[in-house]
Amino acid sequence: MEQFVLMIYQGTTPLPGTPEWEAMPQEEQTRVYADYAAINQTPGLTGGPPLGLPADAHTVVVKDGTTDVREGAHLGTDGAVGGFAVLEAEDLAAAIEVASRIPAARLGGAIEVRPIMEW
C-alpha cells in the first residue's frame, strides 16, 4: 500500500452559504453532500480538519530576514486549498479513482494527488 495526500483546490466550486451555492439546483446540492459523505467512508481515507475560507488566510513570506504577512491565500481564492485528505491506496491509479469522486473535481476545482515520501 502507498500513501497519498489529496489536496482539494476549490477553484470556482460553489461553497455552502454563498450565492453561487444557493443558485445550484437542490438536487445537485444534495448530490454534493452525499458524494462527500461517501468519500469520507472510503477505506484508507483520513480527511483533514475543515479549513477556513481563503479570504481569512494569512500568507507568511520571509525575505532577507524580514517577515512579511499578507492577507489572503497565497495563490488567491481560485488557487486556494479548500481541504485535504490522506489516502492509503494500492497505487496511484487507485488514488486517482478516489480523487475523481471528490465533488470539487467536477464543479470548477481540481484535486492534486501527491505521494507521501518517507525520509
Model-derived features: positions:
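Conserved, structured core segments of small domains
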Residues: 1-119
